[in-house]
C-alpha cells in the first residue's frame, strides 16, 4: 500500500515538472479592422438623405436621445413624454411613425421584432459612441424589410482606436437633467 502511495506521489510530482517546462507556441497576429456597413445612400442614389457628422452631433449632444439630435434634419419631427428629450422619445420622418422607420447600428437592425419600433429609452447616451448618422427619407436603400418604407436611420459607431485615449464629459440642464460620460481605451 505504501509503495502505491509513493508511486502516485512520484507520478504527480513528475507531471507538475513536465507542465512547467512547456513553452507557449501560440503566435499573436494583429488583424485589420473589419467594419460592418449597411447600404448607405450616395450622391448617385435617387434617395433624399442627410448625413449628420460626429462634429454636428457633439455640438448638440447634451444628453438628449438621438431623435432630438436629428430634429434639425429635413422632415423630422420628435416628441418626448417629459418634454426634455430624454427617456421616452419618438421620431417621425415625413409623418411616418417609428414603426415604419428602419433603424440600424453598423448595419444591424435595432427595431423591436414585435412592434417594429425602437425604444430610445433603452439606449441612453448612445450618441456619444456614434461616428455619423445617415437619415434616408422615404423607402431608401434599406434591405431590412417592410419596416423601412417611411425612412431609414443608419448609425455608424466609432472605430477601434490603436492609440490609448481617455475622455470625460459632464452636462447639467433643466429639470435636474444631467449626463456624465467616461470613455477610455488602451
Residue ranges and their predicted role:
Residues 13-15:
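N-terminal signal peptide c-region/cleavage motif recognized by signal peptidases
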Residues 18-20:
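Boundary at the C-terminal end of the N-terminal hydrophobic targeting segment
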Residues 24-25:
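Coil residues (strongly favoring Ser/Thr
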Residues 31-61, 90, 133:
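N-terminal periplasmic "start-of-domain" segments of outer-membrane beta-barrel proteins
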Residues 66-69, 89-92, 104, 120-125, ...:
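N-terminal periplasmic accessory domains that precede
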Residues 67, 71-109, 131:
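Extracytoplasmic beta-strand/coil segments of soluble accessory domains associated
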Residues 83-85, 145, 173-176:
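Short sequence motifs at beta-strands and strand-loop junctions characteristic
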Residues 109-137:
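Short acidic/polar hinge/loop motifs at secondary-structure boundaries
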Amino acid at each position: 500500500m505504501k509503495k502505491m502511495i509513493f508511486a502516485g506521489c512520484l507520478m504527480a510530482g513528475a507531471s507538475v515538472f513536465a507542465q512547467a517546462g512547456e513553452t507557449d507556441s501560440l503566435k499573436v497576429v494583429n488583424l485589420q479592422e473589419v467594419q460592418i456597413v449597411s447600404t448607405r445612400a450616395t450622391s448617385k442614389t435617387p434617395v433624399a438623405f442627410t448625413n449628420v457628422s460626429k462634429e454636428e452631433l457633439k455640438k448638440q449632444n447634451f444628453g438628449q436621445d438621438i431623435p432630438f439630435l436629428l430634429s434639425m434634419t429635413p422632415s423630422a419631427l420628435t416628441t418626448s413624454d417629459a418634454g426634455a428629450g430624454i427617456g421616452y422619445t419618438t421620431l417621425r420622418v415625413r409623418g411616418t411613425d417609428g414603426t415604419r422607420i428602419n433603424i440600424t447600428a453598423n448595419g444591424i437592425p435595432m427595431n423591436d421584432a414585435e412592434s417594429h419600433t425602437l425604444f430610445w429609452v433603452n439606449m441612453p447616451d448612445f450618441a456619444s459612441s456614434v461616428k455619423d448618422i445617415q437619415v434616408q427619407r422615404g423607402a431608401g436603400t434599406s434591405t431590412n424589410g417592410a419596416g423601412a418604407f417611411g425612412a431609414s436611420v443608419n448609425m455608424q459607431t466609432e472605430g477601434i482606436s490603436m492609440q490609448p485615449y481617455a475622455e470625460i464629459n459632464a452636462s447639467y440642464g433643466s429639470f435636474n437633467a444631467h449626463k456624465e460620460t467616461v470613455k477610455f481605451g488602451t
